[in-house]
């Protein structure tokens, strides 16, 4: 008996690429998705065969593509970043913006909450990383030893005993920052192309990075060293660890690869069946990934504006 993924349905509502998806353990029937249509949709998951969920509310305010969205650990707030150069904090009960964060001089590409929700980090095309408090005040701008190109992704470690920020950029670098003094702790060198994404494991012990070279590189955050590399075979747009299995998922071009990190083997490869009359048409690319908090459901956002939903099932392959 092996675990495999079974497609469960789709979520239709966006009119632009789905750039990010966020889930929260507090509300298992709700997810958020960010899009190039400038909105964030709050979905109510119905898990029907036809429609896996319905758009409950649209969070409007950004004037350009929304690049990233995350949910606070209490499930009450969302944080978004946009190509309009700002971050926004949203009250999810009312759907309104409670704070606008102004300071970046170019598109914001990535945002994150610290484990205690008291700090916010953002990465931008202006090549800086900014640390903010929840009142929207920029407390620190990392410029020393910073990326020499766009900062494509920033993430906090969930482990409060090792307070760090991990970032990656179009300079092919993965950088680990000491949160206490915002100083560079480690440079992880090895990628041969620009980087799109970095993600930290649920226990904070390792991170994975990916981008143009199609390689998912795993790094030990405690030891500050490269562990191993998994070949994705196509540009990696998104990476995420399973919350309860030793799995890493990668959005590789139009498909999703799931690796079991114990044996470094592929558990499953997810391709959506697109019926197209024109075989030259580029298949939709997978641009975002998120697991449900219980690790049973995988949500994936695409360039055809849909979210596709898979579930872990026990198979007999």
Swiss-Prot record:
Enumerate the subcellular locations listed in this protein's record, separating them with semicolons: Cytoplasm
One Gene Ontology term, aspect cellular component: cytoplasm
Which terms does the record give in the GO molecular function aspect? protein kinase C binding; ribosome binding; translation regulator activity
WD repeat start-end pairs: 13-44, 61-91, 103-133, 146-178, 190-220, 231-260, 281-311
Principal location: cytoplasm
InterPro entries named in the record: G-protein_beta_WD-40_rep, RACK1-like, WD40/YVTN_repeat-like_dom_sf, WD40_repeat_CS, WD40_repeat_dom_sf, WD40_rpt
CDD domains according to UniProt: WD40
- Which GO BP terms sit in this record? angiogenesis; convergent extension involved in gastrulation; negative regulation of translational frameshifting; negative regulation of Wnt signaling pathway; positive regulation of gastrulation; regulation of cell division; regulation of establishment of cell polarity; regulation of protein localization
Kindly give the Pfam families that the UniProt entry links to this protein. Answer: WD40
Keywords, A to Z, come to: Cytoplasm, Repeat, Ribonucleoprotein, Ribosomal protein, WD repeat
Per the record, the similarity remark reads: Belongs to the WD repeat G protein beta family. Ribosomal protein RACK1 subfamily.
State the function annotated in the UniProt record.
Answer: Involved in the recruitment, assembly and/or regulation of a variety of signaling molecules. Interacts with a wide variety of proteins and plays a role in many cellular processes. Required for VANGL2 membrane localization, inhibits Wnt signaling and regulates cellular polarization and oriented cell division during gastrulation.
Name of the molecule in the record: Small ribosomal subunit protein RACK1
Please give the organism: Danio rerio (Zebrafish)
